[in-house]
């Protein structure tokens, strides 16, 4: 990416001046966006994968007796986990490409290196990245909204679990509060003919005391936060690439070397 004359330029300017010029060519917005995207996708993919696995275990253990009742849920979780693998790989490669494009456009805008300039093909490539990143941001906005569904559902489940746990410690018999239930069928996890489909009384209290239940709640919240961080990174990418492209177009119209 750097021209051959870069080594001669460093020798002529000195080490300090060369380092300053190199640091000036770093696309800090793209670098920050890359770090945010890596962090967000790691949270979303890692925590989302484990949250789905824990959800399958909880439903299989406490809410169904017949394996046919949750076969659709198990298939959905399996396929969605494969989608998570693909998302992690795609965003890793795409963020690397965006960071490289940020180095290219930033160096061309600041004219850091004498022979390093943009071409019409390079500007078209930058415009392509802008459009693709914008489309990805819109799609990921829908993913972020979709991620809010299991997060809010786990938050709703967490409330009766906390209530059941506290009453277990203060009441001699939890069966006195048998009306406190969690029904997996009303959230679409199981068909309405699934038996028992819900947990009440002592069964609910035993679920709420398991480590898997509270870990699943934390994992869904972390996955939701990761999706938000990745969405922020995509919007930062759009802003940074659009700004660099606009400057390149402006300098090109003025007839300056860029």
UniProtKB/Swiss-Prot annotation:
The chain crosses the membrane at residues 23-48, 83-103, 129-149, 219-239. GO terms for molecular function: structural constituent of myelin sheath. PROSITE patterns: MYELIN_PLP_1, MYELIN_PLP_2. Central nervous system. Highest levels in spinal cord and medulla oblongata. A lipid is attached at residues 18-19, 22, 121, 124 (S-palmitoyl cysteine). Disulfide bonds join 181-200. Residues 49-82, 150-218 are extracellular. One of its GO terms (cellular component) is myelin sheath. It is found in: Cell membrane. Keywords: Cell membrane, Disulfide bond, Lipoprotein, Membrane, Palmitate, Transmembrane, Transmembrane helix. The keyword Ribonucleoprotein does not apply. GO terms for biological process: axon development; central nervous system myelination. InterPro entries: Myelin_PLP, Myelin_PLP_CS. Belongs to the myelin proteolipid protein family. This is the major myelin protein from the central nervous system. It plays an important role in the formation or maintenance of the multilamellar structure of myelin. May be involved in neuron and glial cell differentiation. This is Myelin proteolipid protein.
């Amino acid at each position: 990416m750097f021209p051959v004359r870069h080594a001669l330029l460093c020798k002529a300017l000195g080490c300090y001046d060369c380092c300053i010029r190199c640091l000036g060519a770093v696309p800090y917005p793209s670098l920050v966006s890359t770090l945010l995207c890596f962090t967000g996708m790691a949270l979303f993919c890692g925590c989302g994968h484990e949250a789905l696995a824990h959800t399958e275990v909880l439903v299989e253990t406490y809410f169904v007796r017949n394996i046919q009742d949750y076969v659709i849920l198990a298939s959905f979780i399996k396929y969605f986990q494969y989608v998570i693998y693909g998302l992690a790989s795609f965003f890793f490669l795409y963020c690397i490409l965006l960071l490289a494009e940020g180095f290219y456009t930033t160096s061309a805008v600041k004219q850091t290196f004498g022979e390093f300039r943009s071409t019409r093909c390079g500007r078209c490539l930058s415009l392509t990245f802008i459009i693709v990143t914008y489309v990805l941001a819109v799609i990921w906005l829908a993913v972020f909204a979709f991620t809010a569904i299991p997060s809010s559902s786990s938050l709703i489940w967490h409330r009766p679990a906390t209530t059941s746990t506290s009453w277990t410690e203060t009441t001699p018999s939890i069966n006195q509060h048998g009306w406190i239930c969690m029904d997996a069928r009303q959230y679409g996890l199981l068909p309405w003919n699934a038996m028992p489909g819900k947990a009440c009384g002592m069964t609910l209290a035993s679920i709420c005391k398991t480590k898997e239940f509270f870990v699943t709640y934390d994992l869904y919240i972390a996955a939701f936060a990761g999706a938000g961080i990745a969405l922020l990174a995509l919007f930062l990418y759009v802003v940074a690439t659009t700004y660099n492209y606009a400057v390149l177009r402006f300098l090109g119209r003025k007839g300056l070397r860029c």
